[in-house]
């Protein structure tokens, strides 16, 4: 008898392939089922908000995966998905709450006044008194809009809609359907958080990595200056590009952080990070919250500092070992994305407190690539425009 470890992936691939209406190998099936499940079904298990909408949305994505094929009418399907996604975001505009953009606006005001934005409690945060725990890239991203006195939520809304337009223009119906219908993505597009913009910056960084490891190092260095979470893809990048990729990341990071380090020093920045880490005294959207829902009482926070960082270290080790075992063959693009995603999820969610909004940081790259990784074909005549951007990759 063959071991179940051999038969199970093939059986799952056949089942997913039946739903999709085409034959899939286990890797393709994992991407086709895994991305919608992560963004649609996992949040739907959390009580409250409108996350339950992820269940019918998952069915809609399955229908898109089965029905939308290359042909003369597919442009209409893409336009309908695009319109539905924009309408969903308009319906949920302002739903939910986050004080991140309020803090960012106040931090920019302090920076313009010649003061440090770090290690300060901002009264306009939710709840009042939270610090600014982000980097210079975040300040630079929002600065032009803050100077024009825009409501920064509209920046997030525009970025979210721009992603939908780009996915439609590339002819990627599955990624477009996931991005359009995911309740979490529609909510964080205007709830006052900065995760949508962080996801766009990370998308650009990872697409640069697809074009070359040194470019990827520069991109991740810049993205890490927005939120440190982007550095989850560093181990895979270094295993691909070696010391040149690492040097590019370090130099880009130094260029981003040098003005802040020279003007205010590392102390206030590190203090803001420690301050932000200790703000939340309740377990939610995390491993601790999952366990607490079963035990019925409050769980202590200290074990989850261990699970978070020890688990992250184990995943980093697994990524490095996997990449080393593949040598001299290069790490595949799918394996590179999956390794960084695993580090990202473990470090952020095997913790005491986390946020549903963090999923918006990885959603753009997943929606951008899921059609290709699942073996789907672009579906309309704008394909030549997409091909011009399909450059040779070091991730073979």
Regions found by a protein language model. Give the residues of each.
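Transmembrane helices and adjacent periplasmic/lumenal helix-loop junctions
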Residues: 218-239, 352-358
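A juxtamembrane structural motif centered on a specific transmembrane helix
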Residues: 370-396
